[in-house]
Amino acid sequence: YRETIRKNKTYVSIGEAVVEIFKAPYSNDLRFDGARIYKGRKGSDVGKMDTILFKLQGGPVSTLQLDIVKNTESVLTLEAMKNYDYSLTGVVEIDEKPHYIIEFMQKPSVEIPLFMGSFYIEVDTYALTEAEFGFNLTNKAAAASIFIRKKPLGMEVTPEVASYRTRYREQDGKWYFAYSRAEVKFKVNWKKKLFNTFYTTMSEIAVTDRTTEEVIKIAGKEKIRPTDVFSEQVEAFTDPEFWGDYNVIEPDQSIEAAIR
C-alpha cells in the first residue's frame, strides 16, 4: 500500500505499508473487508504545507472500498443502475484477451454527484476484469461536502479531479481483487491570498499473495478504520530494506508495475 500528498508538483507526504487483508465473501453483503498494518513507514515535509496540515483518511481501507464487485451499492446494484446510462462503445485487448468496453454516466435528471467511467468485460467469460471511473464534479459545492471532513474558516477547497481504477486477476478459473488506485486533486484558495494552491492525494494497493487456509478475521483493535489517518499509524522511514528487492519504488511509479 502507498499514499502520497503533493502540494502543486512537490511531494510533501508519503506513506507505505505491507498490509494484511481479510477479504470477506462476495456473496455476503453483511461481512466487510478488513486490513491491518504488518509494517509501515512514512516521510513528510510539514514545512512545505504552509499553513495547511493536509491529511488523508482511510488508508488501505479506502482502496479496498474501490472493489466495486464487493461494494456494489454505488454502481452495480439494480437500484443504483436506475441512475445511470450505459453503452457498449467498443472492444479492446487486455492481457491478450478481447474485452467489451461498457461506458456509464449518471442520467441528466439525477442531481446528486455520482460516478462516470468504463467497465472492461472479458468477451469469453463476461468477467469484469477492470474498471476506470471518476466522480462527477459538475456540482463542485456538493462534491466538496463529500470529500472534505474539516477545513479552516476563510479557506475554499474545491475538488478538481477524482479518478479511480480497479483491476482483478484470474486464478484457477476465478477472478480476485488485485489492484486499486485513487487520485483526487483539490484547489485550495484563501480569501486573502492572490494565488491558488493545488493538493493532490494518491493512494493505491496491490495484492502480492493470497491464501484461503487458516483465515482468521482481523481483530477490531488491530483493524484500520475508515476514519483513521494512515500517516498517524506508522513511523518515520527507518527500515532500509522495507520493500526487500523492490526497496526503491519512485513515488510516480505504480506499485502494481513495480512488483510484477
Across the structure, where does each feature detected by a protein language model lie?
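Extended beta-strand-rich segments in extracellular/periplasmic secretory proteins, especially
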Residues: 67-122, 127-135, 166-170, 175
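Surface-exposed, low-complexity/disordered segments
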Residues: 1-83, 95, 148, 153-260
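Short, cysteine-centered beta-strand-loop-beta hairpins and adjacent loop/turn segments enriched
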Residues: 109-113, 138-142, 187-191
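Solvent-exposed beta-strand/loop surfaces of large extracellular or lumenal domains
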Residues: 141-149
